[in-house]
């Protein structure tokens, strides 16, 4: 069903509806280590994504502001109520061993049931490839999960864990605005790749947002 839905749509990003879900928010800050706070980092990245997507004609919906932290079920309701084309959840991780590091992307799937989101898996792979091609974050691969956010959203949904704040190198990267710009560009190019036909595709890590504009991908 998802494959058919995406194959008949225009490759243009204009008028697509993309929901961005930055984790935590408000008084609930999430992970915090090495001077970096999860809720602040992911919201800043969400805003960078939002600005770039709006410039490409996308309708963007954020599930929270800087000052609130909706329940997960409310975030899911937001995504479903706006008839989203895609949902992107942003998170960072932490672990007791500071050597843990890297980026991982999750999509809906249950290996025990043989069920997977076809578009979600493809999108997760595209995001993972683009981020790892443009940054030096360790590639922790893509994984199928049956978390509520992935399972209950109608649109293809991915969650990106963008590094470990408990790891000094990852935290230092994420604290840098230029690095967050790299992440934003990688995600946006991955979004466009999802709608490109195979003959229009380009080598991973080579497309830039300006290339998308020149190609007329905003109607």
Kindly label every feature range from the protein language model.
Residues 1-219:
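Catalytic-site microenvironment of enzymes
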């Amino acid at each position: 069903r998802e494959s058919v839905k995406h194959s008949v749509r225009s490759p243009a990003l204009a008028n697509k509806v993309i929901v961005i879900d930055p984790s935590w928010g408000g008084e609930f800050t999430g992970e915090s280590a090495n001077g970096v706070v999860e809720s602040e980092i992911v919201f800043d990245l969400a805003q960078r994504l939002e600005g770039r997507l709006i410039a490409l004609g996308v309708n963007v919906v954020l599930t929270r502001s800087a000052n609130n932290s909706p329940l997960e079920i409310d975030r899911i309701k937001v995504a479903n109520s706006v008839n989203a084309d895609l949902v992107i959840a942003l998170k960072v991780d932490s672990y007791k061993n500071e050597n843990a590091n890297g980026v991982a992307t999750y999509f809906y799937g249950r290996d025990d049931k043989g069920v997977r989101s076809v578009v979600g898996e493809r999108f997760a792979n595209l995001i993972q490839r683009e981020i790892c091609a443009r940054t030096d974050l360790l590639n922790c691969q893509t994984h199928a999960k049956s978390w509520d956010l992935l399972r209950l959203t109608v649109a293809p949904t991915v969650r990106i864990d963008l590094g470990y704040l408990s790891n000094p190198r990852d935290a230092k990267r994420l604290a840098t605005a230029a690095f967050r710009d790299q992440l934003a560009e990688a995600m946006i190019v991955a979004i466009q790749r999802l709608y490109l036909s195979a003959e229009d595709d380009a080598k991973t890590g080579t497309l830039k947002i300006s290339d998308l504009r020149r190609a007329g991908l905003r109607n």
